[in-house]
């Protein structure tokens, strides 16, 4: 008889912002993401709460120079780079408002200069301040997915573009992908991680993995995926080493 030693499967628990707000009064307004003092304070409170209530994590966590929370997900950075207005609420994740750009506006899109475009310019300045104060920086932020961001730029018309304006669709996907590569390579160089704010499970495998949100992929057919999205996912995989969340 063959006896096998079962290996434990690591699991991580992520709670909705509304749970944090109702249970501990943590607000997810803009300051949660951009006030570094408040962010460090909230991170400490959240880690203590998880241990005290569920015995998850360390019993006596200390403050750390974190740039993005690993306890909630919210892919607003890349849509914001393309000019999407972001709705912040006390008890919800950030909500990018689609721009619904016209065809000419879409074709004029270029890859943003991340060092000089909000919110990356603000986050980069934050990184520098944390680096100077603590000597290191940890964490990252949810970078969203290729199709997700394309929809936030173009709106639901983007689904029709696959059939009516394929060149336009490819242009949007190309620009979005290059922006994702720019932000991803920058973040990995600064903190060593890319996806803790998307799915903390990566810490149990390889924290440098690029695992991104791609919720909307299930809304397109396999044929559309192969023809339009796969080439850009493949480029991300080759340059940033990533896994897709579907």
Residue ranges and their predicted role:
Residues 75-96, 146-157:
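Aromatic- and acidic-residue-enriched segments that line the glycan-binding/catalytic groove
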Residues 19, 67, 81, 98-100:
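Intrinsically disordered, low-complexity segments enriched in proline/serine/threonine
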Residues 3-5, 59, 89-91, 100, ...:
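A generic structural signal for short, solvent-exposed coil/turn residues
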Residues 1-39, 45, 62, 66, ...:
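Active-site loop segments of alpha/beta catalytic cores
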Residues 31-82:
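An N-terminal, globular interaction/scaffold subdomain
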Residues 90-125:
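A gly/proline- and charged-residue-enriched helix-loop-helix capping module
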